[in-house]
């Protein structure tokens, strides 16, 4: 019982600041560990546009100073903008969604955070073995990737497009789980793609309202 336990809420983004907070905490307490649980239920009305995407699930992640799977890099770039694209008012069973606006906000948030990330850290798409996205539905991340991939060489385009399909394999079966969606995609990638220690994975987290964050992690040797 002698542990600190609290909840973070920010739409589909909440697990990412929880992980970043855990990372900062462990920088001062390297012998500790932090358990982050990303859990939610995406439920929509019958015959609504969101009904085919709905899902429920959770992803539990142990954050430690000596990771055995993925080492988070100190390179996160967040982008925030006031957008009323998705909300669930108190007392409402289902969320209210401005679908077209939400798609545009997602892609803009990705482009802005990625472009600033690339500028700050002098990176290109060729530096990544794969990119993982928040996946409200499986084509959403692909749309975001398509918006920047023409800047990459053909080999990089083929690799990122192919690895994206591996990364959303589990999401196709589970559906949208909101804040755990990005991390379910990461699990899917790690279990279905032939990756090696030392390779870099790019991650894009998004939450309506809105905030997006692009960051990366390096696979640990022997992570399999």
Residue spans for each PLM region:
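Catalytic phosphate/nucleotide-handling subdomain of diverse soluble enzymes
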Residues: 187-224
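Flexible, glycine-rich active-site loops centered on histidine and acidic residues
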Residues: 27-60
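Glycine-rich beta-alpha junction loops
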Residues: 41, 67, 76-81, 134-139, ...
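Conserved beta-ketoacyl condensing-enzyme motif
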Residues: 1-16, 122-148
């Amino acid at each position: 019982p002698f542990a600190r336990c609290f909840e973070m809420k920010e739409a589909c983004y909440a697990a990412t600041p929880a992980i970043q907070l855990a990372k900062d905490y462990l920088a001062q307490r390297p012998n500790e560990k932090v358990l982050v649980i990303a859990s939610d239920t995406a439920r929509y009305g019958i015959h609504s546009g969101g009904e085919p995407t709905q899902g429920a699930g959770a992803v539990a992640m142990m954050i430690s100073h000596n990771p055995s799977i993925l080492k988070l890099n100190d390179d996160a770039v967040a982008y925030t903008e006031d957008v009323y694209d998705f909300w669930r008012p108190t007392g409402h069973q289902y969320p209210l969604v401005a679908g077209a606006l939400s798609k545009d906000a997602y892609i803009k948030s990705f482009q802005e955070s990625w472009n600033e990330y690339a500028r700050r850290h002098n990176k290109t798409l060729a530096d990544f073995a794969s990119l993982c996205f928040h996946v409200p539905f499986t084509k959403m991340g692909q749309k975001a990737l398509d918006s920047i991939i023409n800047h990459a060489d053909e080999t990089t385009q083929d690799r990122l497009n192919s690895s994206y399909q591996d990364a959303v394999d589990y999401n196709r079966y589970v559906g949208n789980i909101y804040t755990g969606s990005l991390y379910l995609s990461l699990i899917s990638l790690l279990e279905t793609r032939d990756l090696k220690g030392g390779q870099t994975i790019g991650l894009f987290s998004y939450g309506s309202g809105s905030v997006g964050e692009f960051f990366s992690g390096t696979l640990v040797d022997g992570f399999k």
